[in-house]
């Protein structure tokens, strides 16, 4: 079956990840998945939330938002509405959980990395693109901090679904909006599942359909991991000055520049 954009059912959209999009961020990446574009920026601060102080563990958190005209019609900023919507909270927590699956919080030390994921253009799969791009920003932030070993595996995500009775990989908006079943799968580069979110919009799906969707997702995540690795293997983009450390290669970094 050929889809509306010419892809086969098991084909990802064209995906690119460009590092260093925000020169002030310790790590940043712009991910494009078809027409969907998400800017991910990782900010490092010394210290951890009050409830984690003295534990020797770091913290990774995430915030997700969408520009007012990322969609077909304008949406007010949530700051103007005076409250954060439930969908935004849900996606922010999903991104944070997914990234923490990729990191050794003890190796991070008592430092916090906050990842801001801003959707510039939405054409389906914004949360999965955010996770995939945010990992690259996180990895660069750990390098900047002098703690690259804190990254223990990669993590990425992709959507799958059933459209017109046919299982498909990486749904665009027109497919997602008419899907019989919609699912988001988060997977590590080591092969573990972090999260599987699936919903039947109408008729319940069979176990065989679930297995087929997971197979599509695994193949898609394998390809996304390759794209992440290729992006991180490229020469690093210019960023803020690295923090001063006690000794080169000691991995004892963790203090910000004090000017941020």
From Swiss-Prot:
GO biological process: rRNA catabolic process; rRNA processing; tRNA processing
NCBIfam families: RNasePH (TIGR01966)
EC number: 2.7.7.56
GO MF annotation list: 3'-5'-RNA exonuclease activity; tRNA binding; tRNA nucleotidyltransferase activity
Function: Phosphorolytic 3'-5' exoribonuclease that plays an important role in tRNA 3'-end maturation. Removes nucleotide residues following the 3'-CCA terminus of tRNAs; can also add nucleotides to the ends of RNA molecules by using nucleoside diphosphates as substrates, but this may not be physiologically important. Probably plays a role in initiation of 16S rRNA degradation (leading to ribosome degradation) during starvation.
Keyword check for ATP-binding: no
Disulfide bonds: none
Organism placement in taxonomy: Bacteria, Bacillati, Actinomycetota, Actinomycetes, Frankiales
Subunit field text: Homohexameric ring arranged as a trimer of dimers.
Binding site for phosphate: 87, 125-127
Catalyses which reaction(s): tRNA(n+1) + phosphate = tRNA(n) + a ribonucleoside 5'-diphosphate
Protein name in UniProt: Ribonuclease PH
Enzyme class (EC, first level): transferase
Keywords: Nucleotidyltransferase, RNA-binding, rRNA processing, Transferase, tRNA processing, tRNA-binding
Residue ranges, compositional bias (Gly residues): 248-260
Family as reported in the entry's similarity comment: Belongs to the RNase PH family.
Keyword Membrane: no
UniProt xrefs under Gene3D superfamilies: GHMP Kinase, N-terminal domain
InterPro entries xref list: ExoRNase_PH_dom1, ExoRNase_PH_dom2, ExoRNase_PH_dom2_sf, PNPase/RNase_PH_dom_sf, Ribosomal_Su5_D2-typ_SF, RNase_PH, RNase_PH_bac-type
HAMAP family hit by this protein: RNase_PH (MF_00564)
Region (Disordered): 232-260
Native source species: Parafrankia sp. (strain EAN1pec)
């Amino acid at each position: 079956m050929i889809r509306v954009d010419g892809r086969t059912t098991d084909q990802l959209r064209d995906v690119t990840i460009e590092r260093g999009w925000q020169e002030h961020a310790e790590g940043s990446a712009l991910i494009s998945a078809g027409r969907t574009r998400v800017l991910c920026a990782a900010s490092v601060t010394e210290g951890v939330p009050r409830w984690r102080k003295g534990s020797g563990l770091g913290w990774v958190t995430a915030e997700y938002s969408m520009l007012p005209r990322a969609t077909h019609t304008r949406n007010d900023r949530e700051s103007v509405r005076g409250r954060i919507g439930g969908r935004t909270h849900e996606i922010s927590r999903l991104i944070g959980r997914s990234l923490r699956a990729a990191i050794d919080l003890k190796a991070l030390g008592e430092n916090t990395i906050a990842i801001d994921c801003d959707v510039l253009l939405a054409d389906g799969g914004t949360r999965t693109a955010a996770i995939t791009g945010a990992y690259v920003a996180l990895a660069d932030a750990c390098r900047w901090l002098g703690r690259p070993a804190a990254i223990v595996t990669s993590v990425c995500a992709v959507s799958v679904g059933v459209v017109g009775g046919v299982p498909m990989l990486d749904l665009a908006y027109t497919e997602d909006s008419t899907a019989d079943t919609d699912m988001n799968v988060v997977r590590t580069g080591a092969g573990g599942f972090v999260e599987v979110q699936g919903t039947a919009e109408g008729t319940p799906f069979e176990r065989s359909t679930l297995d087929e969707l997971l197979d599509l997702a695994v193949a898609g995540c394998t390809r996304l991991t390759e794209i992440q690795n290729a992006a991180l293997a490229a020469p690093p983009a210019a960023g803020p000055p690295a923090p001063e450390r006690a000794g080169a290669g000691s991995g004892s970094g963790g203090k910000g520049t004090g000017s941020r």
